[in-house]
Amino acid sequence: PLSGRSYVYQAMRISGAGDITAPIAETRAGKLPQQVISKTAAHGYSSYGNQIGLATTYVREYFHPGFVAKRMELGAVVGAAPKENVVREKPEAGDVIILLGGKTGRDGVGGATGSSKVQTVESVETAGAEVQKGNAIEERKIQRLFRNGDVTRLIKKSNDFGAGGVCVAIGELADGLEIDLDKVPLKYQGLNGTEIAISESQERMAVVVRPEDVDAFVAECNKENIDAVVVATVTEKPNLVMHWNGETIVDLERRFLDTNGVRVVVDAKVVDKDVKLPEERQTSAETLEADTLEVLADLNHASQKGLQTIFDSSVG
């Protein structure tokens, strides 16, 4: 929603776990117990939203053995903004790109691909840096900034930083771009050009503004105590160019990038099309009592009030 200059005012969370009542001793080697994952994920998710001041009005966790191998975490938000405050224009040569928000670190390097890799007992030692470190207060400041119509009307186009970092968030804004990675604010020294370009550190936004609007935009960012620096310019030549440490380390034609790489074809076989919904149950007068007890013992029918009250549903 922030990319669309909207203010987020409502959220929901749907998750999936295995049997959280299973004995700790039955946990697979190299894995965390389901109850630990379920509780920790809920506390982390709710902490972020509660600090921002975001009302989370629907929270539900489903339980199924299939979620042991791959836990489900689904989040969605609703945002809105006055139509006149949302400007959508095509960037032109000479326009500048401002990076605002959090600083860039090694956290999140490879996160987009890492989330789909096979996890092993060594993953906790080798894949920790793929996880981004959130900063809810920084995100709240950006939300406050984007509620200001005088700010959002200066923005021609914007992107938030997700998978791919600078490569994607800035790389998608225009066909021709010249990016100076040395100007990207860092959490600490020692990052090379590749790490700066692909880091998925959170709470960052990239916006396109006219050169004459840079000072006004940066001044508004400073009022909210948000770092904002010019890191790129839009160019006439349709190439994605990145400079670091006095050298050009990337120079790719847009027409090549637009091919989206090698096409992958995968065969798939649907094996469960006739499986009935878990909620669909049949009973009879003879088995009604036993069937009722079975339903009541199912985790999917148990009260989730304890989980739901972790999330603030009235703030905002």
Residue ranges and their predicted role:
Residues P1-G316:
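Glycine/proline-enriched, intrinsically flexible loops and inter-domain linkers
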